[in-house]
């Protein structure tokens, strides 16, 4: 729980059975499967592997460290990842926190990791609880988060 990793393109990775993750990634319609755990599709056929294509895309550099050390701070946004494709922060709300998006030319996505809260903006509000995801449109300049919750905050910078 609460582990964070930044796995750049070209790094072979796998997700084990029973793991729940938030996989935030750049826009892409490409996945190269080098192994598929002997799974089959809805017709009982093995899914296609892309081993030859993958070899050209894999980063074989040794000693790559992907884990992100972070310590959430109450009513603050703590950066986890900032890259050319997206920014991801963790936000722990206790009580009330106002977030300004005026300098941001992007939507914001909040994923509720724990707890529940109410998101309030000039023309409305929305409640969210653990496991839910909320898309905040780019036209909202400011939002107040009220409650007790831990969130992922994702946007394009």
Report the location of each language-model feature.
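Short acidic-glycine-tyrosine-enriched beta hairpin
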Residues: 1-6, 121-140
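Conserved hydrophobic/aromatic beta-strand scaffold that supports enzyme active sites
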Residues: 4-6, 12, 21-23, 88-90, ...
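Ligand-binding loop in jelly-roll beta-barrel domains
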Residues: 10-30, 138-157
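Non-heme Fe(II)/2-oxoglutarate
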Residues: 17-20, 26-44, 110, 131, ...
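C-terminal amphipathic alpha-helical segment
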Residues: 32-104
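Glycine- and acidic-residue-biased ligand/ion/polar-headgroup-sensing regions
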Residues: 93-123, 131
């Amino acid at each position: 729980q609460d582990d964070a990793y930044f796995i750049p393109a070209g790094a072979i990775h796998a997700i084990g059975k029973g793991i729940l993750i938030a996989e935030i990634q750049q826009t892409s319609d490409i996945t190269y499967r080098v192994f598929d755990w002997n799974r089959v599709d809805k017709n009982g056929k093995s899914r296609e592997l892309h081993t030859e294509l993958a070899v050209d895309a894999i980063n074989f550099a040794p000693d790559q460290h992907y884990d992100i050390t972070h310590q959430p701070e109450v009513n603050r946004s703590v950066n986890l990842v900032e890259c050319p494709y997206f920014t991801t922060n963790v936000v722990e709300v206790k009580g009330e926190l106002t977030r300004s998006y005026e300098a941001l030319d992007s939507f914001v996505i909040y994923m509720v990791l724990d707890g529940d809260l109410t998101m309030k903006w000039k023309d409305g509000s929305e409640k969210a609880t653990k496991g839910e995801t909320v898309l905040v449109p780019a036209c909202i300049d400011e939002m107040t988060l009220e409650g007790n919750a831990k969130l992922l905050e994702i946007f394009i910078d």
